[in-house]
């Protein structure tokens, strides 16, 4: 186990992917929970309306993004392994201003529509990231590599995302009132540039570090 862990974190590309995937999960879990609250507080939707809108529009968008990410990785990475992560990196950078616009507009229907494309783009990293992780280590360490990414996503993403989003929202109430969640989401939208940067950094290391695939 110790040898596998050392091998996994001895790869700079893996470390960059680990950071990017964990931070993406942090933002995704936080936005996923509090976007529903945002539509209720800011746009006046009922719990049922907000939940249904998110489930149909953003749920389907997430599925499309996951499939599209794998397809684009296969296409762009066929001749150059560095491009396995090009689509996720570029997509997340493009998603940031679109997310901000979705949280900014006053019409909830326009907001939902604007959130669909960035949701697709932000979900596109799953397949490429896990594929790269498997190729960065020997077969004996692949299970450990995948489990470390899942561990980071759950600890940082699920464990901290919703909690910190909620704490920040509470802190902003004196300033923003019922729009406090909206302001947290404004910030979260632009923070998507961070995982985009780390996926890009990882892509620069892939050609040198990939052991297989």
Predicted feature residues:
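Extracytoplasmic gate region of multi-pass secondary transporters
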Residues: 6-69, 122-130, 157-165
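Conserved glycine-rich helix-kink/hinge and helix-boundary motifs of the Major Facilitator Superfamily
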Residues: 18, 51-52, 89, 143-148
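Interfacial helix-cap and linker-helix signal at transmembrane-aqueous boundaries
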Residues: 39-40, 72-73, 77, 164-174
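A membrane-interface helix-boundary motif in multi-pass transporters
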Residues: 46, 83-86, 169-190
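A late C-terminal transmembrane helix in Major Facilitator Superfamily
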Residues: 66, 136-174
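Cytoplasmic membrane-interface "Motif A"-like loop-to-helix N-cap segments
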Residues: 74-91
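Hydrophobic core of transmembrane alpha-helices in multi-pass small-molecule transporters
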Residues: 109-126
């Amino acid at each position: 186990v110790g040898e596998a862990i050392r091998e996994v974190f001895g790869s700079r590309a893996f470390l960059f992917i680990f950071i990017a995937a964990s931070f993406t999960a942090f933002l995704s879990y936080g936005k996923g929970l509090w976007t529903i609250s945002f539509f209720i507080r800011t746009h006046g939707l009922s719990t049922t309306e907000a939940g249904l809108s998110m489930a149909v529009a953003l749920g389907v968008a997430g599925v499309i993004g996951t499939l599209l990410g794998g397809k684009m990785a296969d296409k762009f990475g066929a001749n150059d392994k560095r491009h396995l992560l090009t689509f996720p990196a570029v997509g997340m950078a493009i998603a940031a201003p679109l997310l901000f616009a979705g949280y900014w507009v006053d019409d909830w229907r326009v907001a939902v529509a604007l959130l669909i494309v960035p949701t697709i783009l932000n979900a596109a990293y799953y397949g490429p990231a896990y594929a790269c992780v498997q190729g960065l280590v020997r077969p004996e360490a692949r299970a450990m590599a995948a489990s470390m990414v899942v561990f980071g996503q759950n600890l940082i993403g699920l464990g901290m995302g919703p909690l910190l989003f909620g704490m920040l929202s509470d802190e902003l109430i004196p300033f923003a009132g019922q729009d406090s969640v909206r302001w947290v989401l404004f910030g979260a939208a632009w923070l998507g540039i961070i995982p985009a940067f780390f996926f890009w950094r990882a892509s620069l290391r892939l050609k040198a570090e990939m052991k297989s695939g």
